[in-house]
Each structure stands twice: as C-alpha cells, then as structure tokens.
C-alpha cells in the first residue's frame, strides 16, 4: 500500500472568526428559547474594540443583543484590555432588519403547496435557499470522523481547558491547531506533524511554552501509539504570539466552514452554519446529510460515505441526492440511495422535526466542530437507524 499525508486544522473559541460564530449562535439560541419559529440570519464581525452584529431576524420576541454579545465574549475569556479585547468596554453596534418578504414567500409556503401538489403538511415549508450540502462519515474514529480533524479539534479544546482551569496560567484565548496524519492506503497509522499556535502572556519564553504544550496538551490528547521519534512539533513557530484575538485579526461569522465540518477530508457546499435558524438548509440539510452518512457507516454498509443534497429555494423536496462510498460499499450505491429514500425524510420541515432543530443549543457546536462531538448529545450524531439499515441491506 502507498503512504500519504493528510492535514486538518482547528481553532480555539478565542479565534476571531470563532468568536463571531459563537456570538451569532448565542443570539440565535436566545431567540429560539423564546420563539422557536423565529427566522434568524445573524452575522457578526469583530475588530479591535468593536463588535458589529448585522442580519435579518423575524421574531415575536425581544432579546438584548449587546448583553448577549458581552456575555459570550466574557465566557470565551476576553475580559481584560491586555488580552487584546475586553467584553465590558468594547463597542457593540447592531444593524438588524426583518427577513426579506420575497424569501419568506417561499419558506412560508413551498412551491408544492402553491401548486396543490403537496402530500402532507411537511411540504408546506420550502427550503430557505438554493444550494448544495455534503455530509460525511468514515470508520477511522469511534465518532466516525476523519482522524486529522478529530485530533485537531481535541487539541484545540484541550488548549482552552488548560487555560480556563489554570493548568497553564499564561495562556490567552486565541489559538490554532493542525494535525498531519500518515496513512497506509486508507488506514491512519501515525501522526506525522503537530502544529500549535497559542496566544500567551509576554512574560513566558518559547521553551516553556513548547514543553507545556507537549506535556499538558499533546500527550493528554493524542494516543501514544500514534506518536513516535519522527513526529514533528511546531509550537508557536513565529516565536511570539502575544497580540491575538480581534486585535491581531478581524473576525467574521462563517469563515471557518472547513473547521466546522470535516477538515477538508470531504467536500463542502460552501454554506456556513452559525447564526442561521433551521429553515436555512445550509445548516439543517448539512446536519441531515451527516446523520444519513453516519448511520450508513454505523450500519456497516460502507467504510466511508459522503452524501450530497441539493435544494431549490421555496421547494421542499431535495432536487438531488448523491451517494459516494469511495469503493468501500458493501452493497451498491444505488441500493443505499434507495434505503435513504425509504428511511430518511429530507424535506426541511421533516429535518427540523426529526432532529429537533428548533431547540436552542447551537452555541455548543459553534466551536470545536459541529460533527463527531462525543461530549454532546446531538440528534444528528445518533445512529438510531443503523440496525434497521443493516437488516434491510441483508448484512
């Protein structure tokens, strides 16, 4: 078998783009708590001393957006000006409008309903936009995710944990991780390279940071059997990372879509998740596609599975569904597609119902990945249809 390297990255909750994702989803959660049927498209931008929240929100409730923004930033850890951002003193600007009436026409009543072709009430709601969404699963890890992104997320989360619990007191919120895994054919065999860039106080030297990162972060997360004497470590390779967060780089909602999904291991339709309610198929259909792919792999129908869904704005049924098993399928892809059509309802209203997507809780996935989260009970991560699929496939 041939050897190859694959690399994925993650970022901590203090990364400027991830700050924006969390703020947008915290606002979404607060609105859904009071008005589950609200339409939300909330975008956030941050720069030095400034937060701008803009978008389209149609709701019957009131939420205090500046208060939510400040609380989210405080929980992330930007509480002092010397960290590069202060939740108490930053400016918060809002520019919120209602959802376009033209878009609402298609979401409120789907094309099938307008033509009198709808079979049930689930076809009364149309997709909130056109677009393509991908879902993926593979058997490289227990959570059925690619190993590079799984390790990158866990390292990033560990960076945050050791900062917040005081294990490494000089750390600050901003940070990034990157993991390169060596494959023998399609099997991951070792970790080739680990990159960690972490914001820190000015008082600490590079040697101390490297020692602490390897001892308290890498060795606590990466299985020892994946590390060897040839594994390379790049810890803060610029030599200094004191200026970070929005002071170092401006941030924007939806700019970490590969981090949010599969780390580049699978395709991506281009749509971001955070700040969007579930009528936006960018989010809900991507979650549904992961749910389908994960159940297919959990059922043993394939070692790898990628699902593509496509929608037209204002139309409830998917325009197309594609199954790709990369030669690992135990049954034909056409047969898998038939099972999907039989056991998964991929109309937006059905996805929202089956996955409980009107419930708040989106901020929990706004950092460290929307998929493969063993630390959270996510409906789209359940494998409750795997046994049924296995039986019907005759495996």
From Swiss-Prot:
Binding of ATP occurs at: 15, 174-176, 240-241, 249, 255-256, 272, 276
> What do the Gene Ontology cellular component annotations say?
cytoplasm
> Which positions bind Mg(2+)?
17
Binding residues for K(+), per the UniProt record? 43
Transmembrane ranges?
A: none
Q: Where in the cell is it found?
A: Cytoplasm
A GO molecular-function term, please? magnesium ion binding
Among CDD domains, the record links this protein to: S-AdoMet_synt (cd18079)
Protein residues bound to L-methionine:
56, 99, 249, 280
Give me the reactions it catalyses: L-methionine + ATP + H2O = S-adenosyl-L-methionine + phosphate + diphosphate
Q: What is its EC number?
A: 2.5.1.6
Alphabetized, the UniProt keywords read: ATP-binding, Cytoplasm, Magnesium, Metal-binding, Nucleotide-binding, One-carbon metabolism, Potassium, Transferase
A Gene Ontology biological process in which this protein takes part is:
one-carbon metabolic process
What's a Pfam family in this record? S-AdoMet_synt_C
User: Per the record, which residues fall in region Flexible loop?
Assistant: 99-109
Q: Which domain of life is it from?
A: Bacteria
Which pathway is this protein engaged in?
A: Amino-acid biosynthesis; S-adenosyl-L-methionine biosynthesis; S-adenosyl-L-methionine from L-methionine: step 1/1
SUPFAM superfamilies assigned to the protein according to its UniProt record, in alphabetical order: S-adenosylmethionine synthetase (SSF55973)
Cofactor or coenzyme needed: Mg(2+); K(+)
Q: Which family does it belong to?
A: Belongs to the AdoMet synthase family.
Q: Output the HAMAP family linked to this UniProt entry.
A: S_AdoMet_synth1
Q: How does it assemble?
A: Homotetramer; dimer of dimers.
Question: What does this gene product do?
Answer: Catalyzes the formation of S-adenosylmethionine (AdoMet) from methionine and ATP. The overall synthetic reaction is composed of two sequential steps, AdoMet formation and the subsequent tripolyphosphate hydrolysis which occurs prior to release of AdoMet from the enzyme.
According to UniProt, the name of this protein is S-adenosylmethionine synthase
Record lineage: Bacteria, Bacillati, Bacillota, Clostridia, Peptostreptococcales
